[in-house]
């Protein structure tokens, strides 16, 4: 993958869109088959009650809308926005990191970029994937496509790092993969433990909000509401320094360890 930094996107023109389609292809196939079957039934059947016919057409509309809108939104986010141009990261942080940790659940698209952005820093990458906690087929397909990784396998419940090891932790589209509330709380407690005094966490996530519902339909339940990240920060001794939208669908949060 091309991980260039700056004015050129870090992906090809449609790489992000293609990946989303590949990781979630059963949903798209099921959606388009449903549209075809229901539409054919409505056109060929004359005995359908008018109210049922209306409801079926409404259902077809929403399925078609979410199939198309989710792909358009994904293309916007992952291929056309500033997100994967990467230069926003140094400007969002108050200072360049010296010792950083990049955490993901098996799909690492940022560690090489971080090393380029911060050449004088010391960085480590951890893969916290847990097959029991993260059982969704899409993440399994993403990991299979990613192949072998140089990331260090870690248990998100107990990081293999000493207290206050890192001044910055990067969580880029990763934390939402921990689905259990109690597990997320343990995870954030570990983040707090390994952060140095006044250390920072850069969190990037979709939000479970109206914009993501409009684009992804019921799939927006895969995301966490922004208030969940605020709750976890408050619970574990972190404070939100800054929040920013990158496109209507993605929220960037900078958290700091309270002294």
Residue ranges with predicted function:
Residues 167-182:
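A short SAM/SAH-binding and catalytic strip from SAM-dependent methyltransferases
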Residues 198-205:
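Conserved beta-strand signature within the Rossmann-like core of class I S-adenosyl-L-methionine
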Residues 14-33, 39-94:
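Class I SAM-dependent methyltransferase Rossmann-like catalytic core
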Residues 99-102, 106-158:
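Class I SAM-dependent methyltransferase SAM/SAH-binding core
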Residues 156-169:
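A short acidic, Gly/Pro-enriched loop at the edge of an enzyme's catalytic core
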Residues 184-197:
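A short glycine-rich, Lys/Arg-flanked "PGG" loop and its adjoining helix->strand segment in the class I
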Residues 236-259:
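Core SAM-dependent methyltransferase catalytic element
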Residues 221-237:
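Short alpha-helix
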């Amino acid at each position: 993958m091309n991980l260039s930094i700056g004015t050129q996107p870090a992906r090809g023109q449609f790489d992000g869109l293609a990946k989303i389609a590949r990781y979630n292809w059963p949903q798209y196939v099921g959606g388009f088959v449903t549209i075809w079957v229901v539409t054919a039934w409505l056109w060929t059947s004359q005995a359908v009650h008018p109210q049922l016919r209306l409801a079926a057409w409404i259902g077809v509309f929403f399925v078609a809308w979410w199939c198309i809108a989710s792909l358009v939104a994904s293309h916007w986010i992952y291929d056309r926005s500033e997100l994967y141009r990467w230069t926003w990261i140094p400007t969002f942080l108050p200072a360049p990191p010296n010792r950083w940790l990049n955490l993901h659940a098996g799909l690492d698209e940022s560690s090489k970029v971080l090393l380029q952005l911060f050449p004088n820093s010391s960085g480590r990458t951890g893969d916290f994937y847990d097959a029991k906690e993260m059982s969704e087929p899409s993440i399994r397909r993403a990991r299979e496509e990613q192949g072998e990784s140089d990331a260090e396998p870690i248990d998100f419940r107990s990081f293999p790092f000493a207290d206050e090891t890192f001044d910055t932790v990067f969580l880029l589209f990763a934390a939402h993969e921990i689905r259990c509330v109690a597990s997320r709380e343990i995870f954030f407690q570990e983040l707090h433990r390994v952060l140095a005094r006044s250390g920072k966490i850069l969190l990037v996530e979709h939000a479970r909000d109206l914009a993501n519902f409009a684009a992804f339909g019921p799939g927006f339940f895969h995301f966490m509401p922004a208030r969940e990240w605020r709750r976890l920060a408050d619970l574990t001794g972190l404070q939100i320094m800054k929040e920013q939208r990158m496109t209507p669908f993605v929220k960037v949060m900078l958290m700091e360890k309270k002294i």
